[in-house]
């Protein structure tokens, strides 16, 4: 199995080559492609499986456009959701086969389910992203377990959602954490029934990062040489950040000195319960829910009951969800859930003891907005579902087995009687939740984002889908002075192979505008720094309502943060590292800012004078050659191309450059290339090369 090193370089770095090879053989079925389904499909297709099939034979509705970024207004009431987005999904990664699953309709529901379950036998993972009847999920899960197929079931109901996983009765995990193997120097090892290993923690810089259940091996131990056996590993019991126990060492030789202890990873078995059995054991305290937000005590249990109430309504109303803000529907669900709660309390079911009191508003909010797909919520759960698909390879520990989460804090300050009259628009699901007043504020916003990489692309998509900056005289500015590379394509979904070498910000802006033609977005290539304060001046910063940091440089973050504080602008900073991520909401004078907690800049960028005149390290030579190549064959060539293709745009860009000296330099370079193109003879080319070499 060959994996494209250039396209998947970051994934290989994160997952490892063996996992990437396993991913490249996966066959995935995604049932439902509203907001959650299309997010999941987008994420996993970028990851490079063999096949992804989608199934959603329902007609496109106008409110689908608020969360499915691959559907358009021309699709509404004309084609099925799966047919509407399959082509654009396939464009994300040409090495992945993307198709629509066709299932013949049957008069008898049992015959249809049987036929459907036979169709799924070819897949490794089946993902359900829409509410389904319990009997369908039960039979589908049973079919998956019989064929060792992983089942993942996710749902977004307005501002709440859940994920259920069933990886079968015998799933093997090859790597629980995905972290690098740890290695430590040994300081001492005791000789007793519970052998204690103390590591040499020099100045507290090498604390233990392994814990109970991890395995280690030893080498180069003097004295207690029995530990050096390469065929023997030891399960550890964590003691503190400098020591752990490895079991009985009383019959070993006395430890003298030295030694290295290093972590080893052993395959582990995982047993999941099927959907019906896990649901039946919901009150068993030995099978607790995963709690994502520890501040909401008892919330997960209450949400589960609310979801059960919505499902009962769905089953009793011909597989229809409660109407958006239909208070009769919502109150009937609240009453049913309240009875469930009272019965559980009377029977003293231990699992429900975590619910301090019945919060009617939580259940009401689940019920009244169950039919809504809110774009950022879909993005959140879509990321989780896609990561669970990756875990089917044996990398990382799957969710065990329920994950439930909500975002109801975002509506705490919105009045219950706010105007939520629907407009038959792409934003109807948002209007149903937030109201028309908030939607109007969203549309009237001006936003500035720095960076159009992986997180920047996701931010752009989310803001565009929600309707930000769609009113007259509003604008979403995104700036990034980088160009698109091949390695960007498997995580920056707004770019395609034909875009390699072009500006990230400009292509990203164009791509999102196709998703929502009403989105006023402008891509810029200007770096945000002191040298460009003639462009990003006081007037520019003052006009913005919100700032987003989507950069990968500490220095850039610090500079932007200083402007955020100076001009009193709310902002969000975020970044990723492999499968980890962080985000910070910044409100000047109310929260910490980035500079309040920013790490000292230890690794400085290499000064230009060092690169050009005093290169002393191999890194200097590499950086010099990379910079030179980019200048000769990427940046300068792109400017020449723009001069011929988009003269007005080139002229405007040159005028924005700032200093006359810089403008003159750009024009001289342009003249040199044009002379070379016009006079295409070998001698002229040599003169041009010699001139460039001499000047640099």
Ranges and model annotations:
Residues 1-696:
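Adenine nucleotide-associated cytosolic modules
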